[in-house]
């Protein structure tokens, strides 16, 4: 089973999640639930109180959409997430004691407060939504491999189309390598 946890403005049909899903399907994760949630709040970046409100709203929406999923019927579970979706995925797995693999695309620092045990992460050094140094430190502390892209932003893009495609290709190769290895 694969569950996609998007960001607020980065839906499952955008490149990273679109191709991440295709790579996961290629690796045998054929049952897929793509979450969809919305939040109308403003001024989220750098505003802890607003981010917490957003998290609570989105988490509640995710919980409702996943209500009734019988996780125990699956031998392997994969959570693929982006941005605030990484926090929601980690929190959900923790609350419901779901043993799963995690793919974190541009995680937020709060993601790591849920003591993730199995995963891989990707972040851009010019990501304005993440405390990049804190994310890198937390990822390494929890032994989650993290791949860092020098000039990339929160969409893992640089503004240079060919370079963006190279980054996307590299991210998907690393995603595929992670999924093609036996679970720890």
Indicate where each model-derived feature is located.
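Short beta-strand/loop motif that positions the catalytic acidic residue
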Residues: 121-123, 127
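Catalytic active-site module of serine/aspartate enzymes centered on a nucleophile-bearing elbow/loop
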Residues: 59-66, 160-184
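Gly/Ala-rich beta-loop-alpha elbow adjacent to hydrolase catalytic centers
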Residues: 77-90
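Serine-hydrolase catalytic machinery in alpha/beta-hydrolase-like enzymes
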Residues: 1-73
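Catalytic histidine-centered segment of alpha/beta-hydrolase-like enzymes
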Residues: 45-46, 152-167
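A conserved short beta-strand
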Residues: 97-109, 117-118
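Conserved alpha/beta-hydrolase "acid-adjacent" motif
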Residues: 13, 113, 128-134
